[in-house]
Amino acid sequence: PGSSPSFRLWPTADRDFSLAQAARMAISAEAADARQFEPVLLNQAQNKLADARELIDREQYPKAQRLLEQAAVDAQLAAARSQTERAKQAVAEINRSIENLQNRLEMDEQ
């Protein structure tokens, strides 16, 4: 009759982040170009993920859970900031195209 740890390796509630969930979030952040736009935040997420793995191996589940939650938040923030930056770049490109078209129209009118 051993006691089960409070940490879960699978999601059991909204607040419980599994190792797999946190790793997926870090992968998603990389897919959102976080390596380019938010490398420090992405590295923090990946480091916390690695530290959490070590804590799980040492059965320090509450500490691992906190690190997994932090890693997930860092990864989500890195992804969101990267997506925002990509959107800003797309808007800037569209604005340049509009400006070029306006300049052409003005030249054609002259």
Language-model segments: which ranges?
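Sec-dependent N-terminal signal peptides
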Residues: 1-2
